[in-house]
């Protein structure tokens, strides 16, 4: 049933692509047949819903095959076995190339159906073109699923009694939600991309498509960011090397579209308010989708080495052709409609909020280009010089850290700038508090013993950002308090709820500050390694870890070598750490490291078991990782900010906005 549903879905998507294009084109002339146009559009809409239904059937069939351990399917055999828990059997759905493509195709069909349901009445002129773009994308993925990478291929020969099993590294709770979260971000951003192209193809220069798809942009950006953080956390607790970000090509593949999507999300505000940055916005969303497909190409082509990639496959060529086609189509549409995209207003001052947003676009684009260059450099060097030169973390840090510091200053200053006007009394009135907090932040970092320049600057600029957010909240709250005699704390809550988009954005900035602080702790990491016997100790900083014992713990599907250490801080016992090495059935050559962490707001005490001996000796890697918990907490704050920003507005909006309308 699953294979049949996939095949029918492919032909339905091709049909939907064709009739959507015909319906969009049929309304171009004054003599167009209105009833024929309506019929074509209605037919394309039915194809969208049918495509979603068929892909749901196919996905349910594959999921059922995993849950019942149907090893007659090659894909189920390769990624599951009978000892695998049902939770990880679900994870196995997207553990391999075929299943992850099916998950992508299903999510794309779901988003297309939801977008059609939500927007077909609000954007009737654009919907046929958007349907054409979405169904064209769906056709591409269904082409791969049916003819290149089929998830329902039969096992060659007699059905085996058991499967090979899931990769041990993927048997982690984070892997249950990390890939789907990333995919929601990737696929969700297809919607604003489709409507942007629709606006170009339909000749619409207004910003209604931005207004209608804003929630898609914000929510997809959030899920993509959460997916990146979940991936970092998985690397931190599962890989055992002590860090969370290695500038691996697949890590970079998710970061690049997040950077350009961040620029797009901010830049569209200027188009909505001032009728500016139209070419910027079209280019940013086109490049965002291009980078999404480029990242998929990296993951599936095997051309660029990565510990996260699926390995070499024939899919790489298909994605290479597809990503350049969508890039050429998008850029050609921008060039074709360039006169329509002329700005309605122009920058009136180099020191205004509009100029700050322009600089924001440039900075995020520069960051994305740097990551793109570093990721592709090994391939480019091999093509041009015959030698594959790998770019390490040092390159990314040297180039990106200064750019990121400039970005932090911009985030801190931008809310204080006025629209259109040059620097005036507003800035000089509002800037002293953020500057004072910035100085206190730098002094506090230095007084705490930090001597790393970048870390001190991050602490300083983080305080600057918090100061500017505090000023904005205070000014809005005091205006409401004076107007309605409401107590200041309650006024602050009311003003945030009355302008949720704006103040939700400020809460997101607070979350980003926490993430910046967490990242700033990376240069301060301390590490010690050693091999000790039971009752011996290793020391690092003001911690002492006493090795208690080693146990061999067999379970149904694995053997765990478990060690137990007692941790002391300045002579006081603070807890136990239990790092492990695990050996899974059928995967004995792929042992996993299960680290143990004692965490607080200041630092993580991180221990990995790197080796062991039958006589009880054990080798450990012990690290003090400062401020890591700030990363994860920052993600929660960003979630609150996004929730506030996208929550439906009240009908009666109370304005206590500091900046006013332009």
Task: Spell out what each predicted region is.
Residues 1-30, 36, 50, 57, ...:
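Contiguous transmembrane helix-bundle modules in multi-pass membrane proteins
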Residues 1-5, 31-41, 64-98, 150-179, ...:
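Membrane-interface interhelical loops and short amphipathic "cap" helices
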Residues 530-621:
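Soluble non-transmembrane domains of integral membrane proteins
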Residues 19-35, 155-157, 187-210, 233, ...:
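Conserved, charged catalytic cores of large soluble enzymes
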Residues 55-84, 91-116, 146-154, 261, ...:
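Transmembrane-helix bundle segments that line or gate the permeation/cavity pathway
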Residues 31-43, 118-130, 202-213, 272-280, ...:
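Membrane-interface helix-boundary motifs at transmembrane edges
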Residues 1-89, 98-113, 117-131, 140-151:
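Extended, highly charged clamp/arch subdomains and adjacent linkers
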Residues 123-158, 190-226:
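Carboxylate/His-rich catalytic cores and anion/metal-binding grooves
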């Amino acid at each position: 049933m699953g294979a049949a549903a996939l095949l029918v879905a492919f032909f339905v998507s091709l049909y939907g692509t064709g009739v959507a294009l015909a319906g969009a084109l049929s309304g171009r002339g004054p003599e167009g047949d209105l009833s024929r146009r309506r019929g074509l559009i209605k037919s394309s809409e039915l194809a969208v819903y049918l495509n979603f239904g068929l892909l749901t059937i196919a996905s349910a069939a594959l999921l059922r095959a995993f849950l019942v351990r149907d090893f007659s399917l090659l894909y189920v055999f390769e990624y599951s076995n009978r000892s695998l828990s049902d939770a990880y059997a679900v994870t196995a759905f997207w553990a391999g190339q075929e299943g992850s493509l099916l998950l992508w195709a299903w999510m794309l069909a779901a988003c297309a159906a939801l977008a059609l349901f939500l927007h077909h009445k609000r954007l009737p002129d654009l919907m046929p073109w958007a349907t054409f773009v979405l169904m064209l994308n769906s056709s591409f993925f269904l082409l791969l699923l049916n003819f290149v990478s089929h998830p329902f291929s039969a096992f060659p020969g007699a059905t085996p009694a058991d499967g090979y099993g899931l990769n041990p590294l993927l048997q982690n709770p984070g892997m249950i939600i990390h890939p789907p979260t990333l995919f929601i971000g990737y696929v969700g951003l297809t919607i604003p991309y489709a409507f942007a192209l629709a606006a170009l193809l339909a000749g619409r220069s207004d910003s209604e498509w931005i207004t209608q798809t804003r929630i898609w942009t914000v929510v997809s950006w959030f899920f993509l960011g959460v997916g990146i953080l979940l991936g970092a956390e998985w690397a931190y607790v599962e890989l055992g090397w002590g860090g969370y970000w290695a500038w691996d090509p697949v890590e970079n593949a998710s970061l690049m579209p997040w950077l350009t999507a961040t620029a797009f999300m901010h830049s569209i505000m200027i188009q909505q308010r001032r009728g500016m940055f139209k070419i910027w916005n079209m280019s940013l969303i086109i490049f965002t989708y291009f980078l999404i497909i480029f990242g998929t190409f990296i993951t599936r082509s095997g051309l660029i080495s990565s510990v996260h990639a699926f390995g070499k496959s024939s899919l790489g060529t298909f994605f290479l052709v597809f990503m350049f086609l969508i890039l050429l189509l998008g850029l050609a549409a921008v060039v074709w409609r360039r006169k329509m995209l002329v700005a309605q207003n122009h920058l009136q001052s180099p020191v205004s909020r509009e100029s700050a947003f322009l600089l924001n676009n440039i900075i995020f684009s520069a960051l994305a280009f740097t990551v793109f260059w570093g990721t592709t450099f090994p391939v480019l060097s091999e093509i041009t010089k015959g030698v594959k030169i790998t770019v390490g973390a040092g390159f990314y840090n040297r180039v990106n850290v200064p750019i990121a510091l400039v970005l932090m200053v911009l985030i801190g200053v931008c809310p204080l700038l006025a629209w259109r006007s040059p620097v005036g009394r507003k800035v000089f009135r509002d800037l002293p508090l953020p500057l004072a907090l910035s100085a206190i932040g730098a002094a506090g970092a230095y007084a705490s013993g930090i001597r790393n320049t970048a870390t001190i600057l991050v602490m300083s600029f983080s305080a600057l950002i918090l100061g500017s957010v505090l000023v904005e909240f205070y000014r809005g709250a005091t205006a409401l308090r004076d107007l309605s005699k409401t107590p200041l704390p309650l006024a602050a809550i009311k003003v945030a709820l009355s302008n949720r988009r704006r103040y939700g954005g400020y809460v997101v900035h607070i979350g980003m500050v926490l993430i910046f602080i967490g990242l700033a702790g990376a240069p301060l990491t301390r590490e010690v390694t050693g091999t000790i016997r039971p009752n011996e100790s290793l020391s690092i900083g003001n911690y002492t870890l006493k090795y208690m014992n080693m146990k061999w713990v067999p379970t149904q599907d694995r053997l765990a070598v478990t060690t137990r250490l007692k941790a002391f801080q300045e002579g006081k016992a603070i807890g136990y750490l239990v790092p492990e090495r695990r050996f899974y059935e059928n995967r004995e050559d792929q042992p996993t490291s299960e680290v143990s962490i004692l965490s607080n707001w200041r630092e993580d005490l991180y221990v990995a078991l790197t080796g062991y001996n039958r006589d009880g000796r054990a080798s450990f890697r012990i690290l003090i990782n400062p401020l890591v918990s700030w990363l994860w907490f920052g993600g929660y704050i960003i979630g609150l900010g996004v929730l506030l920003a996208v929550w439906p507005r009240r009908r009666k909006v109370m304005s206590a906005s500091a900046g006013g309308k332009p």
